[in-house]
Amino acid sequence: MTVLGNSILKKEAWDKVTGAAKYNVDEVVKNIFHAKMLCSTCAHAKIKSIDISQALIEPGVKSILTGNDCEILFGELIDDRPPIAKDKVRYYGEPVALVVADCDQTAMRAANLIKIEYEQLPVVNSVSEATKENATLIHENLTDYTFESKYVYPQKNTNISHIVKIRKGDVNKGWLESKVVVEGSFTESQADHAAMEVRNARAEILPDGTVLINTSTQTPFTVKKYISKYFKLEESKVVVHTPLVGGAFGGKACVQLEILAYLASRSVDGRPVKISNSREEDIATSPCKMGAEVKIRLGADNNGKLKAAEMTYLVDGGAYSNISPRLAKAIAVDCSGPYAIENLSCDAMSIYTNHSYSTSFRGFSHASHAFCLERLMDKLALKLGMDPIQLRINNAITVGKTSPTQVKITKSNSGDLVSCLEKLKQIMNWQEGNKIELDNGKVRTKGISCFWKTSDSPTDASSGVLLTFNSDGSINLNCGVVEIGPGSKTTLAQILAEKMKMPINKINVVMNINTQTSPTHWKTVASMSTYMAGSAVLRAAEDLIMQLKKAAAVALKCSSEDLDVGNMRVFLNEDPTTYISFKDLVYGFQYDNGNTVGGHIFGRGSFVMSRLTHLDPATGIGKAAPSWTLGAQAVEIEYDKTECTYRFVKAATVIDVGKLINPKSAMGLLMGGMNMGLGIGSREEFLYDKNGIMQSTSFRTYKMMRYGENPEYVVDFVETPDLSAPYGARGVAEHGIIGIPGALGNAISLAADIDVDKLPITPEYIWRKKTGGKNDTY
C-alpha cells in the first residue's frame, strides 16, 4: 500500500487556515430578508393569546408567523413537534413567533414588541418526575401522533416516548452465581454541542416553485425529504446546498431552522430569507446533548468474572422526541460495554421533560452509559481487591461471545480490547501505581475506562459515489458526505487513490453538497462515512477500472484480463512499458487517422447496509449494525485535598482502528474527542431552575475548558481489520469522547475518596460529597 497509513493533509486545509473557505453564512445574497425567532420565556404553559399588531407596523417588517400559520407536526420518529409552538409551549426557548424583516436589527426589535399571555402549567423538571405515577403529561395525546417508524413504542398516558428491552440469558441464575455485587445510581446533565459555527439556514422559492435551501447541516438529504414531505412538494422541486460546515458534533443532524427559513420565505412570496441563531439561541432553542438518570447492578464471582447485570436508563429527551428513541436504543444495544456478560437485563427509555429536546451528540449516548458502567467496574475492582485493568482484561469480550442483542463476536466485527489495555498500561506507567501521594498536600491519580460503539443506522441506510475524469486524467470524487471537520473527504480520496494506484493530488474532491447533483448519502453521522461512502468509492473505482481496461484492450488489441492500472495508466501486466495514459482514454481513444473508439468514462458506486435487522421488542435480539469500534482510555489528574480542585495531567486513548488510513487525522479526531469528554466530565451542563428556566444560556454561564487547562494527550492504535469495511478501517470520529468521563470519574473517586455518581464533576460537587454540603471545611 502506498497511500493508506500516510498523514495526508486535509484537502480543504489551506482554504481553512487562510480564511478562504466559505461557510453558509459567508455567501452574500442580494435583496435578502432576515428572520428572527421570539422564544418562550416559560418551560410549560398554555398560550392564551399572541398580539402581533404593534410588531407588524414596525418599519421594515415584512411578515410575522405564529403557530397558527403552520399546522404541521414533524419529527424524526414521532411527529410531535410544531415548527412554531401552537396552543402551548413545552420548553424554555421554544419558538413562539417568527419575524421577517429587512434586517436582523429590525426583526429583533419587532419581536420584542409581540405580546404573549401565558397560563403556567406544572413543570416536569427531571426524568424521575416524568415517570412518577400521575405525572403531568407533556404530550397528552402521545399515541395519536403519526409515527415515522413502527418500531417506536410510546406508552399511552405516560411521558415515555419509547422503550427498548434487552433480555439475555438467565439473570436470576446469574445473581445466584454472583458472590460480589455492586450497584449505583447516576445522574447526567444535558449539555451543548458548542460548535464554532452556529446553526443557520437560508431559503428561497423560485418562480417555477423550486425551493432552494442553503444550510449548515449534517443531513442535507433529510432536509430535502422533510421539506418535500411535510409541505407536500415534489422532491425534484427541493434543492439543498451545504458547503463546509464549521463543526457539528451531531447537533446539525436535526432539521429545525431549515423549516423556519422555508416558512419565512413562503410568507414573503418566495424572497430569500436567512435565519441564523445567536449563540444564546443555539444553546437554548436548538437541540442539545441528552441527560440521563441511570441505575445499574453488577454481579461477579470471587475471581471477578461478571455473572449478571441489570440496568435501567431514563434518557432525558426533552420536550420533543426527535432522535431520543434512537439514543435509548443505542444504549441498549451496547449496554454491556466491551465485556462478556451472559446474563443481562436492560430497560432503556426515552422520556419527555420540559427541557430542551435532545439530538445526537458525539458518541451518540455512549459516553453517558460508559460513565455509569465504568464507575461500577472500578467499584467492583475495589470490592474484589483487584487491579482495575486486570478486571477489565478478565472480562473483555472475545471471539465466540455474544453482544447484548446476541450477535456473535468475531475479531473482525469487534477488535482486540486486551491489546488496547496492555498498551494503555505502558502509556500511563501503570506499574508505578494509580495513586501517588505528593509532598504539597496533593495527590496524583489515574482512572481508566473501556468503550465500544456500533452505529444506529436504518437497516437500509445507503451511500452513493460518482467518479468523473478531467481531460488530464485526474479524477473528481463526488459524494453526499458533508465535510464537518474530521477530514472525511480526504479519507475517501485516500481510499480512491489506493484503489486506483495513483497520486492523491490527482484526486479532486467536490466539497459542497447539492442534493440535485450529489449522490445520496444517508447522513454524515455515526462515524459511518468511511464505512459507507468508502465502500461506495471502492465499487465506483472498480467500475472505472473495468471501463478503462475495456477501452484500453481495444486500443492495445489484447484482452482486458491482461491489463492493470497504476500511475494514471493502463498497462500490460507482462510489459508495463506498454501502456495508454488515462488522459488518452477517458473521453474516448483516438487513432492516428482520427477514428475514435469508446467514450466518456465515469464510475458509479453504491452501498447499502445489508443483513441488519430490527430488534425484537421483548428480548432485543437482532443485528442493529455491522460492527464495533472498541478501545481503552485513561485520565491522570492532580487533586488538591484542601480545595477539592483538580487539574488534568494526561489523557490517553488506545483504539482498535482496524486499518489506520490517516494517522494524524485520526489522532486529531481522538484528541478533540478527549477534550470534549473532559469538558462534559468536569464542567459542561445545562442548569435549570425549579420552573424549568435554563440558567446557562451563554458562554459566560455555560462553562467550557480553556486552552491552558488541556493536559498532555496521547493516542495509540491497534489494528485488527474489519473484513466488511474498506481496507479494514473502522470508524473513529466519535470514539475519543466515550470513555473519558468514566475515566475521569474513576480518577476523582480515587483521589477524593468519594463515590462519583454525577456528571459533571465540579469542585462544588466533590465538596458536597465529602461534607454533605453542611460545612465549609472538613
Placement of each model-derived feature along the sequence:
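Flexible, low-hydrophobicity surface segments
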Residues: 1-155, 269
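Thiamine diphosphate
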Residues: 244, 248-275, 488-496
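Helix-loop-helix junctions that connect adjacent transmembrane helices in secondary transporters/permeases
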Residues: 138-231, 396-474, 695-706, 714-716
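Conserved catalytic cysteine-centered active-site region
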Residues: 86-89, 234-242, 267-278, 282
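Short acidic, glycine/serine/threonine-rich loops at helix termini
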Residues: 74-78, 110-113, 215, 224-226, ...
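Phosphate/diphosphate-binding loops
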Residues: 102, 270-317, 535-564, 568
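C-terminal catalytic domains of large/alpha subunits in multi-subunit enzymes
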Residues: 67-68, 232-237, 266-274, 327-447, ...
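Glycine-rich loop/linker segments at domain edges
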Residues: 6, 12-15, 150, 154-201, ...
